[in-house]
Amino acid sequence: MSWSLQPPSFLLCCLLLLFSPTGLAYVATRDNCCILDERFGSFCPTTCGIADFLSSYQTDVDNDLRTLEDILFRAENRTTEAKELIKAIQVYYNPDQPPKPGMIDSATQKSKKMVEEIVKYEALLLTHETSIRYLQEIYNSNNQKITNLKQKVAQLEAQCQEPCKDSVQIHDTTGKDCQEIANKGAKESGLYFIRPLKAKQQFLVYCEIDGSGNGWTVLQKRIDGSLDFKKNWIQYKEGFGHLSPTGTTEFWLGNEKIHLISMQSTIPYALRIQLKDWNGRTSTADYAMFRVGPESDKYRLTYAYFIGGDAGDAFDGYDFGDDPSDKFFTSHNGMQFSTWDNDNDKFEGNCAEQDGSGWWMNKCHAGHLNGVYHQGGTYSKSSTTNGFDDGIIWATWKSRWYSMKETTMKIIPFNRLSIGEGQQHHMGGSKQAGDV
C-alpha cells in the first residue's frame, strides 16, 4: 500500500493522532477519526485500530507522566539544598588556612571528658535510684508499722475504757505458812497470802500443794536463767523476781521472809532442795530443822542434820582435792549470808562478789544455788568472769564445773515429811550452829 493513495482526510486524521497531546487536547474516537472505506478497512490498521489502541493506553501514560514530573520536582529540591550546603561550607572553610596544632586532639579530649562525665552521672543516677527505692521500702514499712501501732493503741484505749481486772489468780485462803493453808482445805498449787506469827503484815508466796495434803512453801526457784541473781544486800533481804500462779518464774523470796517463816513454830521445818540437770535427771537433798536467823545475825543458816536424798549432802562440804581443808571450808551449816556489798564469809576475799551472787558462803562453797546460770550445764574457768566455779553447783551430785538447769528450795513442817518417799533419817550426829 502506498501513502500517496490515501485521501487527504485520512492523512490529516493520522497527523492529529500523532502530534496532538494525549491528555485533554484531543481524544480519538470512531466518530471523529475512523473512515469506513472498504478498500482499506481490512488491510490498513492505521485508521480505527490505531484509535482504539491509543485510547486503551492513554490513562496509564498520563499516570506515568505525572510520576516522572514528581520525581523531577524532588530532584530539583535536593539539588537546591545541596547547592546551599556547598555555599555554607565554602563560607566557613578556607582551604588556604591550615588547621591549628592540637585542635583535633583538644576536641578528642573534650569528647572523652564529656563521655566520662556522662558515664559518671549515669552511675550516680543509678545509685540514687537504688537509694530512692530503698528509702521507699523503708517508708512503706514504717507506714505499715505506724498503722499497726495505731491499731494497737486503739485496742489499748478500748481496753482502758473497761474496769481493771487482776488477771493473776490469788487464792483467798490464808495462813501462817502453806501447810496451814493446805490444812484448811486448799488443794491447788498457786499464789497465796501468808502471815507468819511475828510478821507485821501478810505477803505473797507460791504454795506447792500435793495430793497428800502437803503444803510446801517455796523459797527459791531457778528455771531458765531469765533472772540475774547478782543482787545487793537489800534486794536479797526483801526478795526479787516474780511469783507466778503456775510456779514457772524465777525468784528469791527474801531473807527476812525466810527468817520469819522458819523461826515461827515450835515444830521445826525441813528444807528440801530439788535439782534438775540438762539431761532431765532430777535429785533431792533434805535437811532437818532448817532455820535462818535475823538480820542482826546476818541471816545465819542452821540445820540439825542431813535427812537424805540422792543429791548428797553438799551443805556438809566437799573435798575437791585442792587442799586437805577443802571439806571444812566449803561447808555451809552455821554460815552467815553474804552479798557483794555485805561480806560475811570466812574468805580473805569476797566470795559473793567473785561468784556474782548472794549465799551462805564459807570459803567459799560446795553447794551454791544462787550462782551464775550457765547454759548447757558444763562450763570452765575460762568461761567465767573471775576464773572461779561460780555456777549453780551441788558438788556431791555433779562436778563444780557443772551448772544445774533447774533448782527449787522449799520448806515444810518436819512432821509432814512422807515416810513413804524413801527418805533416810539420820538422827545421830546432828550439826549445830558453830560446829564448823
From Swiss-Prot:
The keyword Phosphoprotein applies. There is a cross-link at Q423 (Isoglutamyl lysine isopeptide (Gln-Lys) (interchain with K-431)). Together with fibrinogen alpha (FGA) and fibrinogen beta (FGB), polymerizes to form an insoluble fibrin matrix. Fibrin has a major function in hemostasis as one of the primary components of blood clots. In addition, functions during the early stages of wound repair to stabilize the lesion and guide cell migration during re-epithelialization. Was originally thought to be essential for platelet aggregation, based on in vitro studies using anticoagulated blood. However, subsequent studies have shown that it is not absolutely required for thrombus formation in vivo. Residues 169-415 form the Fibrinogen C-terminal domain. Keywords: Adaptive immunity, Blood coagulation, Calcium, Coiled coil, Disulfide bond, Glycoprotein, Hemostasis, Immunity, Innate immunity, Isopeptide bond, Metal-binding, Phosphoprotein, Secreted, Signal. The modification Phosphoserine is found at S430. GO terms for molecular function: metal ion binding; signaling receptor binding. Ca(2+) binds at D343, D345, G349. Conversion of fibrinogen to fibrin is triggered by thrombin, which cleaves fibrinopeptides A and B from alpha and beta chains, and thus exposes the N-terminal polymerization sites responsible for the formation of the soft clot. The soft clot is converted into the hard clot by factor XIIIA which catalyzes the epsilon-(gamma-glutamyl)lysine cross-linking between gamma chains (stronger) and between alpha chains (weaker) of different monomers. It holds the Pfam family Fibrinogen_C. GO terms for cellular component: cell cortex; collagen-containing extracellular matrix; fibrinogen complex; synapse. This is Fibrinogen gamma chain. The keyword Metal-binding applies. Residues 1-25 form the signal peptide. CDD domains: FReD (cd00087). There is a cross-link at K431 (Isoglutamyl lysine isopeptide (Lys-Gln) (interchain with Q-423)). It comes from Mus musculus (Mouse). A long coiled coil structure formed by 3 polypeptide chains connects the central nodule to the C-terminal domains (distal nodules). The long C-terminal ends of the alpha chains fold back, contributing a fourth strand to the coiled coil structure. One of its GO terms (biological process) is platelet activation. Heterohexamer; disulfide linked. Contains 2 sets of 3 non-identical chains (alpha, beta and gamma). The 2 heterotrimers are in head to head conformation with the N-termini in a small central domain.
